[in-house]
């Protein structure tokens, strides 16, 4: 939930944030390590917490996860290499990294085979391609149970409109491939994501139990996948992690009784661990009136923070004055916040479908700063070079100390691959 920048229970305070642009430039991503540790602790009942690093793949964040005993999920060769760079070691800890995908390219296939990284397969073809190269490989099956859930159609990870997972009626074909190549089945993974919809979560847990029983194979583990929500707006409900665990643990116990031995329970959070830990600081560069609309234009665009333009996602916005004047209780103006891109959709205050909306914000002027809250997940990791704009620096606070964990990309680096 968006926190006040004048609260001292995190390092993401107005005082701390205002000193960063002078040192690191603007815009800049900022994270608080203590918030990440707090979120990890909330899931301590699960046997394995496996971070979906696509949410925030900076290797310094991954090192923090590893130090807290969190394992990692990788969805590309690049993410495998990031995990290795962060100190995860599949040679000494075979379950440190799991590779999850619906397809596997040749380079990734060779790397997971070389390192014997367990593969969470979302297609029968992928299983067969792996088995031909690496017989006996350890595998998970990502199952699509025929229904889904998500905050946007673009984030729905189940049902017939989703590309993800092996369709539940194709599990016999998957088993044929497993047996043909003597693959070792570790477990079944079901990533649907229910947030605070506990009735839907019960449906997911029930589907997991049914799939395991009907599949008729022994398993070491089940994975609840990800999809734990965080409250992006004031008044939104936070997920009850005790209740969430309780429903999944009941499913795990049913499966363990059926199989006749203990079964590990994994969870694969992404946004839950990092979303609330991050903010994006951006500077106001222009204020103008467009008919009845009051626009504030900032130096960050959707190339930096994609979620509002892509999903219509809400991020709370706070204003900080550059000259020290107080804006905390200042009168507000209905404001459209937009970026610098040569693109009409470069608006941070929009709904899904692109409808522009306003926010009640204090009146600001060029040189002031806006802070976009809860950007720790799918912020920096979804950034692009659109409009030939360099990637932003990332800064991590830990116990009051700020350190650079990614420097700003230069224009020279942006051009380097084309200077042949």
Swiss-Prot record:
Induction: Up-regulated by LysR. Repressed in the presence of lysine. SUPFAM superfamilies: Alanine racemase C-terminal domain-like, PLP-binding barrel. Pathway: Amino-acid biosynthesis; L-lysine biosynthesis via DAP pathway; L-lysine from DL-2,6-diaminopimelate: step 1/1. Its EC number is 4.1.1.20. Substrate binds at residues 191, 271, 307, 311, 343, 378. It catalyses: meso-2,6-diaminopimelate + H(+) = L-lysine + CO2. Is activated by 2,3-dimercaptopropan-1-ol. The active site is at 342 (proton donor). Optimum pH is 6.7-6.8. The modification N6-(pyridoxal phosphate)lysine is found at residue 54. GO terms for molecular function: diaminopimelate decarboxylase activity; protein homodimerization activity; pyridoxal phosphate binding. The keyword Lyase applies. GO terms for biological process: lysine biosynthetic process via diaminopimelate. The keyword ATP-binding does not apply. Transmembrane segments: none annotated. Pyridoxal 5'-phosphate binds at residues 227, 268-271, 378. Specifically catalyzes the decarboxylation of meso-diaminopimelate (meso-DAP) to L-lysine. Is not active against the DD- or LL-isomers of diaminopimelate. Belongs to the Orn/Lys/Arg decarboxylase class-II family. LysA subfamily. This is Diaminopimelate decarboxylase.
């Amino acid at each position: 939930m968006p926190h006040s920048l004048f609260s001292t229970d995190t390092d993401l305070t107005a005082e701390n944030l205002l000193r960063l642009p002078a040192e690191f430039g603007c815009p800049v991503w900022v994270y608080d390590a203590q918030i990440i540790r707090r979120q990890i602790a909330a899931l301590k009942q699960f046997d394995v917490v496996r971070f979906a690093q696509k949410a925030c793949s900076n290797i310094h964040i991954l090192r923090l996860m590893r130090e807290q005993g969190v394992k990692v999920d990788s969805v590309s060769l690049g993410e495998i290499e990031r995990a290795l760079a962060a100190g995860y070691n599949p040679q000494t800890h075979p379950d440190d990294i799991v590779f999850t995908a619906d397809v596997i390219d040749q380079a990734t296939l060779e790397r997971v085979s070389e390192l014997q990284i367990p593969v969470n397969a979302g297609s029968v073809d992928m299983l067969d391609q792996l088995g031909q190269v690496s017989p006996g490989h350890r595998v998970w099956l990502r199952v699509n149970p025929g229904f889904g859930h998500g905050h946007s159609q673009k984030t729905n990870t189940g049902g017939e409109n989703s590309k993800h997972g092996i369709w539940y009626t194709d599990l016999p074909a998957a088993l044929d491939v497993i047996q043909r190549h003597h693959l070792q089945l570790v477990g079944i993974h079901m990533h649907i994501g229910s947030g605070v919809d506990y009735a839907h979560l019960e449906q997911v847990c029930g589907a997991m139990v049914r799939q395991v029983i009907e599949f008729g194979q022994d398993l070491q583990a089940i994975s609840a996948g990800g999809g734990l929500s965080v409250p992006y707006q004031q008044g939104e409900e936070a997920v009850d992690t005790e209740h969430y665990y309780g429903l999944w643990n009941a499913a795990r116990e049913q499966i363990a009784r059926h199989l006749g031995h203990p079964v590990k329970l994994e969870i694969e959070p992404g946004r839950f661990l990092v979303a609330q830990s991050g903010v994006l600081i951006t500077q106001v560069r222009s204020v103008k009136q467009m008919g009845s609309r009051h626009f504030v234009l900032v130096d960050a665009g959707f190339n930096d923070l994609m979620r509002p333009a892509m999903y219509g996602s809400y991020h709370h916005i706070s204003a900080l004055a550059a000259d020290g004047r107080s804006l905390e209780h200042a009168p507000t103006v209905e404001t459209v916040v937009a970026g610098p891109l040569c693109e009409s959709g470069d608006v941070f205050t929009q709904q899904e479908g692109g409808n522009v909306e306003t926010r009640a914000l204090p009146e600001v002027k060029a040189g002031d700063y806006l802070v976009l809250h809860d950007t720790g997940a799918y912020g920096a990791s979804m950034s692009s070079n659109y409009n030939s704009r360099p990637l932003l620096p990332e800064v991590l606070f830990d116990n009051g100390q700020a350190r650079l964990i990614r420097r700003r990309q230069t224009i020279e680096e942006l051009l380097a691959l084309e200077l042949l």
